Each structure stands twice: as C-alpha cells, then as structure tokens.
C-alpha cells in the first residue's frame, strides 16, 4: 500500500509545530523540498542491489524511511516530513523497485530479505540505532524489522497501519472497499473472467507472472489503478496517472501481488503475536479514520497490543 496523504496533525519525528486547516495544501505543512546529499547502491545478494539516499543533516539523528507497496519505491516528498537540520533522512528502494536492480524481480524477494536489507544498510552506514518511519506496507515492514532488531530502534512512527493479514487483504482486494468504491472496483474486478473472480489476488498473480508481456502490463495497469483510485481521500488525477506509467505499475503490481499471495512470508497475525519485545520502543501511530486501503481497525488493534503507544486518528 502506498503512502498517500497527511492523515493527522502530528508526527513524532517532526519538531515543527503542526496545525492544519481543512483546506491546507500539503506543501504548506511540510518542510521545504531538499535534495539528497549522498546516494549509492548496496549489493545485498548475488542477484539484488538496492538504491539508497541520504538527505538532511549528516550529523543529525538518523531515521530510516520505509516506503509502501511493497514495490512503491522511495519518494522525494518523504524527505519533507523531517526537520532537515535535525535529521539524517535515509531512504532506500526495496528489492525489485525504484532504482534497485534487477527491476520487478521476484526471486529472493520476500519480507525476510527486506528485513535483512534494512539491517545491512544500518551496518553499511555505521549507525548504532535509528528512528524508524513507515506507512502502509512501510508500517508492516517497520514493525517486523523492529521485532527482529528491537535494540536498534530509537522510536517507531507509523502511518496508515497495514499488517497484511488475510482479513485486510480480503477487505481491499476482494470485498470491503468495493462497497465504498464500486465504480473504481468494477474495472479491477472485470479484468478477470467471472469464473475466477472468487479469488482476485490469485487471478491477478497468474497474469502478473505470465510469460506474455502484454498480459502482465494489462493486469498491472488495472491492479495499480484500483489502488491509486482509493489511496487518497480526494481523487488526484496525477496519482491515478501512476497506473498509466507501466514501468512503475508492473513492478508495483507484481511485487505487491507476489507478497500478498504468499501471506508476506509469515504466519497470519504475525505482527500482533510478536509485540512483546517492542513495547518499550516509543511508538506513535497515525491513522486516517476514513482510510480505505488500511482500515482503522488495524491501528486500533496494534495500539491495544502496544499499550504505551500514542494513537492519533
């Protein structure tokens, strides 16, 4: 799931006072646009090399920004969520997406690989501990990384909670959000023959992994358009246009579907069942009440498992 919008009036890692009028533009409440001070590639396996960037203050507090999708890629706008004078803002493209290579590759691409890659980046930069910031799928990966390396997390700031449980996948990709966005859901559903519509994720996976490039691209466009149409409170034509960028859509859709059909390579409910070792980590959960992609119930259930967390809806 993609990082789509400002969903509350506070971010733990921002020292900027935050008040937001209903008609405020996002650039009015974020820090100014900045460019990276350093970029590079890190070889994480014989097959995969991941892109990374650092922006802000090289001597500032390190924060790792974990993007959505999976397959969404890092974004320049993510740099604007942090005070560039106080934070060393680190982003990377997860395996197979963005500037990482090979593009749209599914082999050696799973949650455990991603956790390992985050730790490889930390070691590569010589960072002892860092803040962790992630939204949507980025919240999923942030939590699993923290559960595997609780001693490396200074804090967790999570937006749009998505834990990739079967119930969440069913809500968005099969039945649930479809009742709120029937007009956007219909093209996504009707791309699949009626006799396969009982399991849309499986049907899309078959097409997204087809040997026929045109079949892959057509499926990627419809998968991506469905998500882009529902990821923002107010429809954004530029956001919808991402589905027309088939280079982006193919990696985004293939990698997402690959993870989802495999239950993100962990048991269902893994995150909620493994919160005991991260209860000490300062955690802020920011959730949009009307988020169609990442329903509020997930943030609520996570907050109950992390009683010391701060939940902002």
Feature locations, PLM:
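A catalytic-pocket lid/entrance helix-loop region that shapes and gates access to the active site
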Residues: 153-202
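Conserved alpha/beta-hydrolase "acid-adjacent" motif
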Residues: 292-298
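Conserved alpha/beta-hydrolase
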Residues: 84-99
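Short beta-strand/loop motif that positions the catalytic acidic residue
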Residues: 285-287
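Conserved hydrolase catalytic core segment
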Residues: 129-167
């Amino acid at each position: 799931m993609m990082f789509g919008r400002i969903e509350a009036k506070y971010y733990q890692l921002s020292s900027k006072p935050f008040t937001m009028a209903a008609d405020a533009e996002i650039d009015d409440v974020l820090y100014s646009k900045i460019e990276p001070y350093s970029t590079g590639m890190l070889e994480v396996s014989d097959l995969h090399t991941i892109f990374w960037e650092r922006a802000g203050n090289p001597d500032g507090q390190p924060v790792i920004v974990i993007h959505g999708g999976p397959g969404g890629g890092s974004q320049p706008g993510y740099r604007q969520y942090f005070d560039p004078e106080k934070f060393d803002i680190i982003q990377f493209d997860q395996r197979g997406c963005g500037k990482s290579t090979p593009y749209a590759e599914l082999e050696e691409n799973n949650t455990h690989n991603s956790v390992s890659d985050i730790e490889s980046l930390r070691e590569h930069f010589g960072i002892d501990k860092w803040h962790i910031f992630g939204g949507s799928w980025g919240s999923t990966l942030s939590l699993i990384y923290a559960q595997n390396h609780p001693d490396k997390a200074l804090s967790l700031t999570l937006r749009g909670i998505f834990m990739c449980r079967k119930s969440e996948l069913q809500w968005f990709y099969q039945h649930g959000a479809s009742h709120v966005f029937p007009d956007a859901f219909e093209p996504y559903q009707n791309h699949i023959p009626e006799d396969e519509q009982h399991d849309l994720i499986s049907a899309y996976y078959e097409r997204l992994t087809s040997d026929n490039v045109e079949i892959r691209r057509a499926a990627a466009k419809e998968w991506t358009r469905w998500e882009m149409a529902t990821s923002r409170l107010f429809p954004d034509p530029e956001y919808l246009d991402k589905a027309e960028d088939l280079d982006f859509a193919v990696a985004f859709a293939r990698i997402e579907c690959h993870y989802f059909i495999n239950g993100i390579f962990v048991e269902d409910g893994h995150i909620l069942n493994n919160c005991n070792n991260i209860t000490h980590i300062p955690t802020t959960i920011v959730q949009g009440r009307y988020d169609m992609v990442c329903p509020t119930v997930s943030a609520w259930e996570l907050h109950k498992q992390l009683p010391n967390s701060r939940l902002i809806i």
